[in-house]
């Protein structure tokens, strides 16, 4: 199933900034109170637009993606979308176990249980911002990442 989900970042502050987004995605129990580590987070498929955003592959895991907006996000400005949809892998429906029970009268009851019953997916996006003044050093200090900042302000990851 595909879910239209449009995610972008708005700079509601008063200074221009560089921003990064950390997207965590995982499965939780039915009420969302406990993370389900027995379920595969890669079944949650996030469509990243790559429109002005670059992913830090070194920081990625099966549950986390880290993206950097490659331009300065000016005060009051909204970035291009970094996510435009989320879907669940259709193979999920194939993950089922069946048990059969034969009653005293000879009838057989077959019960199907899907592995992902009573689970929900969780997507959390956290935004961090860094000043544009001495950006390279500020980003290294705040985020621990080596970047290049070109004369026009464009950011790239080393």
Q: Where are each of the predicted segments found?
A:
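Surface-exposed, hydrophilic segments of mature proteins
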Residues: 1-158
């Amino acid at each position: 199933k595909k879910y239209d989900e449009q995610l972008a970042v708005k700079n509601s502050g008063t200074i221009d900034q560089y921003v990064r987004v950390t997207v965590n995605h995982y499965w939780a129990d039915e009420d969302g109170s406990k993370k389900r580590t027995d379920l595969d987070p890669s079944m949650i498929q996030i469509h990243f637009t790559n429109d002005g955003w670059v992913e830090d592959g070194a920081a990625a895991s099966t549950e986390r993606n880290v993206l950097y907006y490659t331009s300065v996000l000016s005060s009051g400005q909204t970035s291009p979308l970094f996510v435009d949809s989320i879907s669940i892998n259709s193979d999920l429906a194939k993950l089922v176990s069946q048990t059969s029970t034969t009653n005293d009268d000879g009838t057989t009851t077959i019960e199907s249980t899907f592995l992902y019953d009573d689970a929900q997916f969780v997507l959390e996006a956290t935004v961090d911002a860094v000043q544009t003044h001495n950006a390279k050093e500020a980003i290294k200090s705040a985020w621990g990442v080596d970047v290049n900042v070109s004369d026009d302000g464009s950011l790239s990851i080393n």
